[in-house]
């Protein structure tokens, strides 16, 4: 379990530290009840955007059923839209971490209500000092400690 946690931590750290690396694959639609799915749909195929979705083989390795991320370079309209979607989705969510600056969220970690008893859902969000937006959606048989330890 420690190896899985360590590997997952490295994967998440790589996403936040090197957001431009991986190529995008065709996106499968997120849960229909989440507004952040609109961010993936609206910006996923635009210039200066990297979208990542892990294959089933990778997901099983980490105890996940879905992993999807998007990185958007310096787009103020996308930032406003993403923050609006996050605000809508965080209602009813467990706020694990949230950092604001000048009235706007710059870093957030939410646990959303699950659709199935043993499947948890998480949203991670970060805006870098250079204006790079990173949004991550994770579903799986994980708890918040698995993602932060």
Language model regions located:
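A low-complexity, Ser/Thr/Gly/Pro-enriched, surface-exposed linker/loop concept
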Residues: 76-93
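Sec/Tat signal peptide C-region and signal peptidase I cleavage site
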Residues: 18-26
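Bacterial N-terminal signal peptides that target proteins for export
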Residues: 1-8
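An acidic, glycine-rich, mixed-charge low-complexity segment common to nucleic-acid enzymes
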Residues: 5, 49-51, 91
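Surface-exposed, polar helix/loop patches in the mature regions of secreted/periplasmic/lumenal proteins
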Residues: 88-148
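Early exported N-terminus immediately downstream of N-terminal targeting peptides
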Residues: 26-81
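Bacterial N-terminal signal peptides
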Residues: 9-18
């Amino acid at each position: 379990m420690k190896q899985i946690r360590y590997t997952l931590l490295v994967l998440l750290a790589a996403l936040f530290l090197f957001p431009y690396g991986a190529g995008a694959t065709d996106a499968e639609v997120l849960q229909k009840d989440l507004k952040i799915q609109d961010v993936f749909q609206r910006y996923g195929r635009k210039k200066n955007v990297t979208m990542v979705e892990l294959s089933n083989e990778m997901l099983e390795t980490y105890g996940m059923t879905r992993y999807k991320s998007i990185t958007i370079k310096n787009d103020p309209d996308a930032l406003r839209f993403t923050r609006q979607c996050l605000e809508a989705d965080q209602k009813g969510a467990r706020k694990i971490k949230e950092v604001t600056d000048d009235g706007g969220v710059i870093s957030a970690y939410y646990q959303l209500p699950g659709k199935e008893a043993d499947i948890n859902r998480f949203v991670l969000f970060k805006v870098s000092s250079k204006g790079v937006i990173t949004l991550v959606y994770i579903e799986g048989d994980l708890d918040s400690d698995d993602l932060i330890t």
